[in-house]
Amino acid sequence: MVEAEELAQLRLLNLELLRQLWVGQDAVRRSVARAASESSLESSSSYNSETPSTPETSSTSLSTSCPRGRSSVWGPPDACRGDLRDVARSGVASLPPAKCQHQESLGRPRPHSAPSLGTSSLRDPEPSGRLGDPGPQEAQTPRSILAQQSKLSKPRVTFSEESAVPKRSWRLRPYLGYDWIAGSLDTSSSITSQPEAFFSKLQEFRETNKEECICSHPEPQLPGLRESSGSGVEEDHECVYCYRVNRRLFPVPVDPGTPCRLCRTPRDQQGPGTLAQPAHVRVSIPLSILEPPHRYHIHRRKSFDASDTLALPRHCLLGWDIFPPKSEKSSAPRNLDLWSSVSAEAQHQKLSGTSSPFHPASPMQMLPPTPTWSVPQVPRPHVPRQKP
């Protein structure tokens, strides 16, 4: 019941969010319409700034917007002024509010003494020859730009308003976020709403009728799987089990409870290997086992385990506290030459006693002994340091 109430609250919150979305859509619609009207007003004002604003052009643009039911186009100035005022008022009433200001600015009469001329008289160099033909003049008279702009269809953004959703169809509608997750959950199950006594009785029934409640039939298998498992796997398959060498250098099974992946034969049921049918084993040896024991560093006293073990590396490290102290570098022998430990006089006597009898008077030329195992030492030249 608590979950149903939470689900209902989530749905109500979803409807409230939808209402807020509709209000935002209306605000966007209004802002788009306002921006379109401002852009049209700016375009019309820019066009008027580009064209010369003379009394003749302003009067001609307004005379074209006059109704064609007039009998004379070239009337007196006073009559034309009155007609222009009426036309301007009617045009202001019919145009949208974005263009009313521009039409009012054009509808104001300007004082001029000469009669207004048509646009054809401004373009043609000889207007006097065509004044007598009223028919072609009316056909050639261009329409005003304001009338053309008003007839153009403006792009408008429309949003389809969704109707109120009844509560019955809430479950069938796609929700957003947590509402979609809550809607996908099946909370109307009859089993979950049962009391605890129902489940206790069900458990007692299953315990008393255990044989009837548990299915003892083998699982059905596809015919293709039966054929493949009976023919190909048993004949050509060889079970391979994986082992790993531990620190005591004994092979340990990697997965002792896992049977063979193909024939599903456990490791315990596999018979001993023979020469005719040997058992195949895959053994993996870690690199830490293959390292020699002298490369193992002595552990710190807190982290070193001093308990007895059969592992070779740890057994070699048990005597880390009784290692002999390291000798200093100054006392260590620099080479393995035996002549270095004998004095110079003893060397001279040894060489003179073993000299040859054929040349007793000849002086003995002693060659410096060449050390066989020593590293030749080259004297470094002494360079005096300069005082700064």
From Swiss-Prot:
Q: Specify the inducers.
A: Up-regulated by IGFBP2.
Tissue specificity note: Ubiquitous. Isoform 1 is expressed in brain but underexpressed in glioma tissues, at protein level. Isoform 2 is not detected in normal organs, but is expressed in gliomas with increasing levels with glioma progression. On the contrary, at protein level, isoform 2 is not detected in gliomas, suggesting that this isoform is unstable in glioma cells.
Q: Where is the composition biased (Low complexity)?
A: 37-65
Chain segments carrying region Interaction with IGFBP2? 239-282
Task: Using the record's annotations, give every residue carrying the modification Phosphothreonine.
Answer: 141
**One matching Pfam family, short form?**
MIIP
Instruction: Indicate where the modification Phosphoserine is found in the sequence.
Output: 303
Keyword Transferase found: no
Signal peptide start-end: none
Q: How is it modified after translation?
A: Isoform 2 is degraded by the ubiquitin-proteasome pathway.
Feature: compositional bias, Polar residues: 138-152, 344-357
Which keywords does the record carry?
Phosphoprotein
Q: What does this protein do?
A: Inhibits glioma cells invasion and down-regulates adhesion- and motility-associated genes such as NFKB2 and ICAM1. Exhibits opposing effects to IGFBP2 on cell invasion.
Q: Assembly state and interactors?
A: Interacts with IGFBP2.
Name the chain's protein. Migration and invasion-inhibitory protein
Q: Which gene encodes it?
A: MIIP
